[in-house]
């Protein structure tokens, strides 16, 4: 009997994201996680719909089980914007620009949302969502991982960027979504 785990392809070209996902999933994850950068169109719409469609498109290219992620940073004062477009807002405005977007508002609250879409080969994607609530603050900490320097989770005095990786990986939006995925994948098949 083979002890080899089935392969699950995580569709990302982001090395930081891959390291974080592997650290969160841990050695007991029932799949061998491999990453692959797949050229997917930039979709627009609601985050769960974006994640599902990216998953469908990736599954066609990979021809196997896939996992895709869509991350949002949602400002409550802006009714959820920039949301799934955070990557582009950050690229164009920088960390200071994200803060400037809220300059006219008293409400600096926000939530980080991570949606993982998982599809076994030939199946419809399933969605797993995690959210962490916090606030937008002037950038603090290393600027090597997206918007982490401007997001301070509720109950903490540090931004994601200032936190030890172990701490962040126990409270983050990504952790919460991956825990839901893990729970789904290790649940008993029959009832």
From Swiss-Prot:
EC number, UniProt record: 3.6.1.66
An individual GO BP term: nucleotide metabolic process
CDD domains reported for this sequence: HAM1
Cofactor binding, note field: Binds 1 divalent metal cation per subunit; can use either Mg(2+) or Mn(2+).
GO CC annotations on file: cytoplasm
Chief site of localization: cytoplasm
Family per similarity comment: Belongs to the HAM1 NTPase family.
NCBIfam families for the chain: RdgB/HAM1 family non-canonical purine NTP pyrophosphatase
The protein's name in its UniProt record: Inosine triphosphate pyrophosphatase
Organism: Phytophthora infestans (strain T30-4)
Classification of source organism: Eukaryota, Sar, Stramenopiles, Oomycota, Peronosporales
